[in-house]
């Protein structure tokens, strides 16, 4: 009102707000509280790649595309309204639920909800037979194993940093390959091609590529979205599948998933 942005007039000391003009002003998106987004995000799930999620998006007929850019980038795109959903598995030292912490702290996400997708088993992918006899990250460091790393901000890379810090070590002590890999599948291909000795990804990725697996941790893999997105038909189709026996059977087939809490609300803002 003070700067003239709101359509109104002052008559005999009283402010008058013309209904039609005010409605047009609101519809134009000029009245937005901090973090409010006036337009719908594109039907994209951005963030971490996951084979169970990829299958579920197709099988449910959700109409949602998958953009694999890593957990941190996915959450940033959600906040910027560039994706409808962020698929995330965050990690931080001394924080066993970094997903919820990250969403709660995110700017421009005052209306967020976090839905459990699955718990996943993460660990070291190694060549068949585990030729270097690796059983830990310490072994990988000592053996100077060629370590395939993920891009900065990827959940697997955050987990690697957390595990190394918990062991009073750092990623820099590993024999890292010069290039990084965008997905667990890319990392697995590098190991199959003998371009790398090991790297962190899911048990499902190891199973899919015929690799051996050294378990290191279980993690929450969640879907973050705005509350209004939750009620979209495509999202409801996905959630319906996540609650079905077929979803749980497919998770068992892939391996390394716990889908007992799939579809439950873990956080609302």
Model-based region annotation:
Residues 72-86, 91, 180-195:
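Short helices/loops that flank or line small-molecule/ion binding pockets
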Residues 111-121, 207, 211-240, 259-267:
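Periplasmic-binding protein-like
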Residues 90-104, 188-217:
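A ligand-binding cleft/hinge motif common to bilobed small-molecule-binding domains
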Residues 1-76, 82, 106-111, 137, ...:
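N-terminal hydrophobic or amphipathic helices and topogenic motifs
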Residues 64-70, 171-186:
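Short beta-strand-to-loop elements that line the ligand-binding cleft
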């Amino acid at each position: 009102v003070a700067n003239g942005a709101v359509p109104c007039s002052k008559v005999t000391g009283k402010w008058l707000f013309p209904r039609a003009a005010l409605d047009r002003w609101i519809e134009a998106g000029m009245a937005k509280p901090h973090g409010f987004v006036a337009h719908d995000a594109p039907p994209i799930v951005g963030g971490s790649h996951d084979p169970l999620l990829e299958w579920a998006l197709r099988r449910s007929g959700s109409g949602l595309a998958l953009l694999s850019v890593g957990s941190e980038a996915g959450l940033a795109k959600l906040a910027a309204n560039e994706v409808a959903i962020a698929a995330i598995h965050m990690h931080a030292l001394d924080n066993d639920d970094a997903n919820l912490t990250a969403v709660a702290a995110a700017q421009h996400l005052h209306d967020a909800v976090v839905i459990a997708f699955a718990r996943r088993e993460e660990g070291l992918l190694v060549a068949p037979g585990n030729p270097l006899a690796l059983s830990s990250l310490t072994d990988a460091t000592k053996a100077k194993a060629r370590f395939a790393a993920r891009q900065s901000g990827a959940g697997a890379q955050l987990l690697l940093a957390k595990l190394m810090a918990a062991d009073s070590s750092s990623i820099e002590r590993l024999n890292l390959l010069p290039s990084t890999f965008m997905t667990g599948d890319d990392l697995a291909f590098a190991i199959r091609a003998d371009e790398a000795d090991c790297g962190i990804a899911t048990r499902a990725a190891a199973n899919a590529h015929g690799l051996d697996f050294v378990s290191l941790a279980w993690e929450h893999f969640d879907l973050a979205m705005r509350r209004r997105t939750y009620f979209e038909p495509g999202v409801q189709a996905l959630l319906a599948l996540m609650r079905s026996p077929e979803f749980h059977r497919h998770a068992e087939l892939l391996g390394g998933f716990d889908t007992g809490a799939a579809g439950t609300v873990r956080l609302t803002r």
